[in-house]
Amino acid sequence: MTTAPVSAAERHAALEADLAQWDEAYHGRDEPEVSDAVYDAARRELLALEEAYPDLRSQEGASQRVGATPDSAFGKYRHLVPMLSLDNVFDPEGFDGFVSRVGRFLGLDEDGLQALQFVAEPKIDGLSISLTYEHGHFVRGTTRGDGIEGEDVTANLLTLKDIPRELPGEAPERVEIRGEVFLSKSSFLTLNEQQVARGAKPFANPRNAAAGSLRQLDAEITRSRPLSLFAYAQGYTSSPVATTHWDYLEKLRSWGFTVNPLSQMIAHARDIPAYVEKLARERSELDYDIDGIVFKLDDLSLQDRLGFAGRAPRWAIAWKFPAEQAITRLREIEIQVGRTGALTPVAHLEPVNVGGVIVSRATLHNEDEIARKDVRVGDLVRLQRAGDVIPQILGPVPSEEPRSEPFVYPDHCPVCGSLAERVHGEAVRRCTGGLTCEAQIVERLIHMVSRNAFDIDGLGERSIREFYDAGYIRRPGDIFRLRQHEEALLQRDGWGRLSVDNLFRAIEDRRTIPLSRLIFGLGIRRIGERNAQLLARHYQTFENWRTAMLAARPDSEERASLGAIMGVGDAIADELSAFFSESHNIETLDDLALELKDIIAEEAPSEGHLSGKVIVFTGTLTTMSRPEAKAIAERLGAQVTDSVSKKTSLVVLGEKAGSKAKKAAELGIETVDESGWRVLAGL
């Protein structure tokens, strides 16, 4: 195995950190930070590095991850069959590569490839859910979560008219049905009008609105929002329902589920590009967002044989659409300051319809992007909803009109006036004011009370800004001392006795908090919800974590240990070390900890019975292909390598096993034949 050079390892760590942050924002907070194109490009780069240097790959890494950790405000439920993600293609060549990989795995010749049949389904931009039925009764509904465990949102799903409460007697004794909850474009516009009318923040897009509506602690809020569901797959089933995916969709229809009427059976792979082109033309006329098409092998027995690779099935692929575009005028470029001090340029636009959504703001990413695209205030610009979620400016439209001067990016914070520095190798300029910068203080407080952090009901962005301006809350610990301002609160508009008492009760409920939520709530750069959970599981207690972080100075043994934690890495370790090097941050943390009653440790995740084993396959296997055997081993928690070493736990000997069998004997490593492997794997 080739060991990765330092430059590759550093780039891999940076990509891991970025992808973890973006995953947490998209799946955990329903607030995507980057476009699909940016995300997919970063993930492809990560996969290429891991392909070249396998030692960089870890089972906790972004290449193996699906979704985000479930929110503990809801009950957690372990899926009977994991809810995984999909790999993407963007053109006919990418799809041909998918078909070729399927053929190689199954050992098909050209005739076998031509005989493959597919089911095409529009890829709905919503929230994936799993519905469990037992003895014909709907008993549980969960979100995807991290793919292994999801959030129990049964009470909210019971408000959806598209979900049958009972299945007919022919249904299996126990079955999981997968679907996508979404909000139509017309319902989204109506909902946002209602949000604005009552002074609430409008939703960014239909997906965010659907996800936010389903993940309400009050089911009556969900009931008031017209959510819909398309059923599209099975998870676990106690007895077979069909032999093909198409027949399964027909069965779902007969049970009372809504299946997307645009789903189609496709007899030959060569017909797929025409279907893609047709649906791409029609997508803007649909009353719901789609960002691509999912193609699945129709034969369920072939799906079972193909299984999964990492986080995605081998038998399905998502063909993603290019983003929809429009032209409008750039009115203003505003520089916003985030909780980590990042200066982010936001474009204010003349409102324009892009793919059925009215857009008036767009991201410009950073100063390099502004300079590279040469966009200026007053320009006509080409805009796209990248990944159908985040509006982004592609560049100016050539025009004979006179242009304004090039935009000058500030080198000082527009809020506090501190120097805004740009670290070598980074694209973002950051305010150096830290927690002396009002913008960063307020944004960190908003982050701390957010749903995936302390989740304090009644204390949202608007309240935090109001209480900050009034001087009631200036640092995290002040939240738990808010009762000191009770009389003043009761005199403020909109704060009566009932609302104040409810707020105090919600605050008191959060004096007991999981360690992972505390770590995440601090708003440290690069520390997403998943990283926070990894740290909490590793250090177990607040005292252990705090002591280790204080000791993690540059070049220290503790700093090296921190960077070596699976899924953390050097980039995240550097941010933690920097945070704890500031005395003000330590004082703020300790002040907060004094207000808390109990900081709860995280439970370690359950593992497969081959977890921790390093397995090598050698020779020819007769009952399955080598990739199939590898997939089974990895699913059971093992790591599969190509070479035998002292770290190898087991060598599986197929027919005509050669030098690897000999080396295993020399090193005294356990070996089994193929039948022994099948017994070990529970086949």
From Swiss-Prot:
Its EC number is 6.5.1.2. It is an enzyme of class 6 (ligase). Pfam families: BRCT, DNA_ligase_aden, DNA_ligase_OB, DNA_ligase_ZBD, HHH_2. SMART domains: BRCT, LIGANc. SUPFAM superfamilies: BRCT domain, DNA ligase/mRNA capping enzyme, catalytic domain, Nucleic acid-binding proteins, RuvA domain 2-like. GO terms for molecular function: DNA ligase (NAD+) activity; metal ion binding. InterPro entries: BRCT_dom, BRCT_dom_sf, DisA/LigA_HHH, DNA_ligase, DNA_ligase_AS, DNA_ligase_CS, DNAligase_adenylation, DNAligase_N. The active site is at K123 (n6-amp-lysine intermediate). PROSITE patterns: BRCT, DNA_LIGASE_N1, DNA_LIGASE_N2. Residues 605-683 form the BRCT domain. Transmembrane segments: none annotated. GO terms for biological process: DNA repair; DNA replication. It catalyses: NAD(+) + (deoxyribonucleotide)n-3'-hydroxyl + 5'-phospho-(deoxyribonucleotide)m = (deoxyribonucleotide)n+m + AMP + beta-nicotinamide D-nucleotide. Keywords: DNA damage, DNA repair, DNA replication, Ligase, Magnesium, Manganese, Metal-binding, NAD, Zinc. The gene is ligA. Belongs to the NAD-dependent DNA ligase family. LigA subfamily. NCBIfam families: dnlj, PRK07956.1. DNA ligase that catalyzes the formation of phosphodiester linkages between 5'-phosphoryl and 3'-hydroxyl groups in double-stranded DNA using NAD as a coenzyme and as the energy source for the reaction. It is essential for DNA replication and repair of damaged DNA. This is DNA ligase.
